[in-house]
């Protein structure tokens, strides 16, 4: 009888309800802390998922769309000006069960070469040594494809990926492409990612939003979770796209 009850409880979380659970879970995101240096980040005992990518790749818009909050992740009007690592907590109030890390954009910063190099080193150190790092979401503009800096980042994290670190390449601004162009971009990115997971994403059309939310939830809850673990009926919020999303910027 006990086994039947347990099986029934596990079966009650269907793929559809799991996606809804994941979307509601993402909506619990709130600001946790910010740091200008790696050593200033507090150690966390929960899964941490990092969002990385070039400036103008739509990273802030992606985070705000996934969490259904307009201004959770700050998007600077000048690409590359955001130079802090920002952490956002997920889970019920007083019960954090995962962290999202928003890393500074790279490749377009209107700052000095020394500052660029410093931040590239900070990011590399974070990706290589951050304890608790469970997954990485690399955001790319599919109209530009993966740049040399994106490929360099892949090389930095490859040893950890081979050890089990989760990795997703997210092609943002999918609404700018036709279906045929999306299919081509996916094929190219999959080759560049060395067989890693690749998905299309559009904040404007909400393409891939539920799918990505569910994937991140699975990364953070490998043994599953009960439907009562997160609030329900999270309201969907229309997130404004970043002002620089109309045309791709060339890497510097």
Task: Label each PLM-derived region with a short phrase.
Residues 2-108, 232-234, 239-241, 251:
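Conserved G1/Walker A P-loop phosphate-binding module
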Residues 102, 172, 202:
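Active-site glycine-centered loops adjacent to acidic/histidine catalytic or metal-binding residues
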Residues 26-38, 176-232:
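Canonical P-loop GTPase G-domain recognition
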Residues 41-43, 81-87, 98, 104-134, ...:
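Switch II of P-loop NTPase G domains
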Residues 121-197:
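Conserved C-terminal guanine-recognition region of P-loop GTPase G domains, centered on the G4
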Residues 45, 71, 84, 96-99, ...:
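Helical mechanochemical/support elements of P-loop NTPase systems and associated helical scaffolds
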Residues 244-246:
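Intrinsic-disorder-associated, low-complexity terminal segments enriched in Asp/Asn/His/Tyr and depleted
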Residues 88, 172, 212:
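Residue-level signal for inorganic ion chemistry
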């Amino acid at each position: 009888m006990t086994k039947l009850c347990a099986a029934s409880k596990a079966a009650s979380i269907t793929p559809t309800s799991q996606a809804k659970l994941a979307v509601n879970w993402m909506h619990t995101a709130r600001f946790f802390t910010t740091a200008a240096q790696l050593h200033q980040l507090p150690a966390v005992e929960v899964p941490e998922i990092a969002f990385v990518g070039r400036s103008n790749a739509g990273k802030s818009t992606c985070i705000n769309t996934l969490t259904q909050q307009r201004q959770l992740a700050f998007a600077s009007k000048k690409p590359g000006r955001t130079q802090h690592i920002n952490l956002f907590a997920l889970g019920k109030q007083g019960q954090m069960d995962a962290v999202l890390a928003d890393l500074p954009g790279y490749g377009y910063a209107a700052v000095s070469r020394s500052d660029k190099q410093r931040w590239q080193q900070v990011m590399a150190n974070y990706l290589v040594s951050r304890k608790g790092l469970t997954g990485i979401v690399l955001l790319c503009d599919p109209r530009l494809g993966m740049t040399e800096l994106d490929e360099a980042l892949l090389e930095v994290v490859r040893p950890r990926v081979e050890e089990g670190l989760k990795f997703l390449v997210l092609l943002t601004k999918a609404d700018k492409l036709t279906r045929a162009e999306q299919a081509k971009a996916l094929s190219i990115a999959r080759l560049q990612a060395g067989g890693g997971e690749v998905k299309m994403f559009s904040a404007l059309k909400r393409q891939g939003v539920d799918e990505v939310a569910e994937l991140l939830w699975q990364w953070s809850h490998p043994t599953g979770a009960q439907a009562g673990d997160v609030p329900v009926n999270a309201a969907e919020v229309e997130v404004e796209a970043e002002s620089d999303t109309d045309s791709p910027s060339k890497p510097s």
